[in-house]
């Protein structure tokens, strides 16, 4: 009877004389999905609490972070979470892979590398700077003791620039490698929690290198500027000009005025003059080209100088007696009086007469001819190395019959620019 009463109470049916204990609230059934009341706090957390935990991640200590990371890796739902992240990445990662393109090498960086390599600053060999300096010194044509000292100073300073460049480049490479290694380790560590492919790690390394390349370009740019300043100070063609020695100038002027009818020395004569003056053949050619131009433009200015060298040469030959007939066709030694073969006994004096408008007294000319002797002009005409030229009043040399052995430019009577070819 009691059992039947309990069933009817559960169904909400009252029995007369037996009130329902507990009131109406006792008739409300419990939901099927709700856990029992004795199971403790609910398992789900509020979204606000989750966001608050995310915001406080940066304030955690390393020990707390390692503990949470270990708890996440050991969680039974971690593989499922990782697979969901992989699916999301697979859907969104296609557009990222399609946009990946290899960027070409920066042309400015390539030019800087080529310049540093050409100057001997870059390259595997530590002695490249000295080799480049020696090549530059040879190209400049300087072989005198002063130039050798100057080029030694240039090599020392270039070596200093090279050492500074390699030291700074080593620091740059070390910093770049350290940062790249740190990022790679960080990405590998994160790949345990979120999906990161090896290609993505390589892409990130490329981005880091491009960021660091601006530092490398600045280093190479400053090094190239330092090398260019050094070259302009020591080896550039526009640097301060250095005149020849007084002895070399005397030898060149004496040769020029003694061959005034044909001031175009052959290659053999240039080599001999270069040895006597301690300069190069190229410098001899440049000097004669410039001298011819200046002489044509300022004949009156060089009149006195030409007269002095004419008398000096004649006196030197007169003192030598008739031995001038056997003299060589090129200058003798650097310490001698500088006797040269004239193009003819009359050429030099007649040239002065036609150019300057001032004639020598006949007695002076005859005395000089008598002093030099009758066999002098004959021997000279037999051993002429240059073809005679007619010197016009405007300063141009008109070429006569040019032998095949003479190397002189073909020019007109008033040509000036063609002289520089020799």
From Swiss-Prot:
<keyword id="KW-0010">Activator</keyword>
<feature type="region of interest" description="PBC-B">
    <location>
        <begin position="131"/>
        <end position="236"/>
    </location>
</feature>
<feature type="region of interest" description="PBC-A">
    <location>
        <begin position="49"/>
        <end position="128"/>
    </location>
</feature>
<feature type="region of interest" description="Disordered">
    <location>
        <begin position="1"/>
        <end position="43"/>
    </location>
</feature>
<dbReference type="Pfam" id="PF03792">
    <property type="entry name" value="PBC"/>
</dbReference>
<keyword id="KW-0371">Homeobox</keyword>
<dbReference type="GO" id="GO:0003677">
    <property type="term" value="F:DNA binding"/>
</dbReference>
<feature type="region of interest" description="Disordered">
    <location>
        <begin position="319"/>
        <end position="341"/>
    </location>
</feature>
<dbReference type="GO" id="GO:0005634">
    <property type="term" value="C:nucleus"/>
</dbReference>
<dbReference type="InterPro" id="IPR009057">
    <property type="entry name" value="Homeodomain-like_sf"/>
</dbReference>
<dbReference type="InterPro" id="IPR050224">
    <property type="entry name" value="TALE_homeobox"/>
</dbReference>
<keyword id="KW-0539">Nucleus</keyword>
<feature type="domain" description="PBC">
    <location>
        <begin position="42"/>
        <end position="236"/>
    </location>
</feature>
<dbReference type="GO" id="GO:0000981">
    <property type="term" value="F:DNA-binding transcription factor activity, RNA polymerase II-specific"/>
</dbReference>
<dbReference type="InterPro" id="IPR008422">
    <property type="entry name" value="KN_HD"/>
</dbReference>
<protein>
    <recommendedName>
        <fullName>Pre-B-cell leukemia transcription factor 2</fullName>
    </recommendedName>
</protein>
<feature type="compositionally biased region" description="Polar residues">
    <location>
        <begin position="401"/>
        <end position="410"/>
    </location>
</feature>
<dbReference type="GO" id="GO:0045944">
    <property type="term" value="P:positive regulation of transcription by RNA polymerase II"/>
</dbReference>
<comment type="function">
    <text>Transcriptional activator that binds the sequence 5'-ATCAATCAA-3'.</text>
</comment>
<feature type="region of interest" description="Disordered">
    <location>
        <begin position="353"/>
        <end position="422"/>
    </location>
</feature>
<comment type="similarity">
    <text>Belongs to the TALE/PBX homeobox family.</text>
</comment>
<dbReference type="GO" id="GO:0005667">
    <property type="term" value="C:transcription regulator complex"/>
</dbReference>
<dbReference type="GO" id="GO:0003682">
    <property type="term" value="F:chromatin binding"/>
</dbReference>
<dbReference type="InterPro" id="IPR005542">
    <property type="entry name" value="PBX_PBC_dom"/>
</dbReference>
<dbReference type="Pfam" id="PF05920">
    <property type="entry name" value="Homeobox_KN"/>
</dbReference>
<keyword id="KW-0805">Transcription regulation</keyword>
<dbReference type="InterPro" id="IPR017970">
    <property type="entry name" value="Homeobox_CS"/>
</dbReference>
<dbReference type="InterPro" id="IPR001356">
    <property type="entry name" value="HD"/>
</dbReference>
<feature type="DNA-binding region" description="Homeobox">
    <location>
        <begin position="237"/>
        <end position="299"/>
    </location>
</feature>
<keyword id="KW-0804">Transcription</keyword>
<keyword id="KW-0238">DNA-binding</keyword>
<dbReference type="GO" id="GO:0048513">
    <property type="term" value="P:animal organ development"/>
</dbReference>
<feature type="compositionally biased region" description="Basic and acidic residues">
    <location>
        <begin position="31"/>
        <end position="43"/>
    </location>
</feature>
């Amino acid at each position: 009877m009691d059992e039947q009463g309990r069933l009817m109470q559960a169904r909400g049916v009252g029995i007369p004389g037996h009130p329902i204990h507990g009131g109406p609230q006792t008739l409300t059934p419990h939901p099927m999905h709700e856990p029992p009341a004795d199971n403790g706090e609910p398992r789900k957390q509020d979204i606000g609490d989750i966001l608050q935990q995310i915001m406080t991640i940066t304030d955690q200590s390393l020990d707390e972070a390692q503990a949470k990371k270990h708890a996440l890796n050991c969680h039974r739902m971690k593989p499922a979470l990782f697979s969901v992240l992989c699916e999301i990445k697979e859907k969104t990662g296609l557009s990222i892979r399609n946009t990946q393109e290899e960027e070409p090498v920066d042309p400015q960086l390539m030019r800087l590398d080529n310049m540093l390599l050409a100057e001997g600053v870059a390259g595997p060999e530590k002695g490249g700077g000295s080799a480049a300096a020696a090549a530059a010194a040879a190209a400049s044509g300087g072989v005198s003791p002063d130039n050798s000292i100057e080029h030694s100073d240039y090599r020392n300073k270039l070596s200093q620039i090279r050492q500074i460049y390699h030291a700074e480049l080593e620091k740059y490479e070390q910093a770049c490698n350290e940062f790249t290694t740190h990022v790679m380790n960080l990405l590998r560590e994160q790949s345990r929690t979120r999906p990161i492919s090896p290609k993505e790690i390589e892409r990130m390394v490329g981005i880091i290198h491009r960021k660091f390349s601006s530092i490398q370009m600045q280093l190479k740019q400053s090094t190239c500027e330092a090398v260019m300043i050094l070259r302009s100070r020591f080896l550039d063609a526009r640097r301060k000009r250095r005149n020849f020695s007084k002895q070399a100038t005397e030898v060149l002027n004496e040769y020029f005025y003694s061959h005034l009818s044909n001031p175009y020395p052959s290659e053999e004569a240039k080599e001999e003059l270069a040895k006597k003056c301690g300069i190069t053949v190229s410098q001899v050619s440049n000097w004669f080209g410039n001298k011819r131009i200046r002489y044509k433009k300022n004949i009156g200015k060089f009149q006195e100088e030409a007269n002095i060298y004419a008398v000096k040469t004649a006196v030197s030959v007169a003192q030598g007696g008739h031995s001038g007939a056997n003299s060589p066709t090129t200058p003798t030694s650097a310490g001698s009086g500088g006797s040269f073969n004239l193009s003819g006994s009359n050429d030099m004096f007649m040239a002065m007469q036609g150019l300057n408008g001032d004639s020598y007294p006949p007695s002076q000319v005859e005395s000089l001819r008598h002093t030099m002797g009758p066999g002098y002009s004959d021997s000279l005409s037999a051993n002429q190395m240059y073809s005679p030229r007619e010197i016009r009043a405007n300063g141009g040399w008109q070429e006569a019959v040019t032998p095949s052995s003479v190397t002189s430019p073909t020019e007109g009577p008033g040509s000036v620019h063609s002289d520089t070819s020799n």
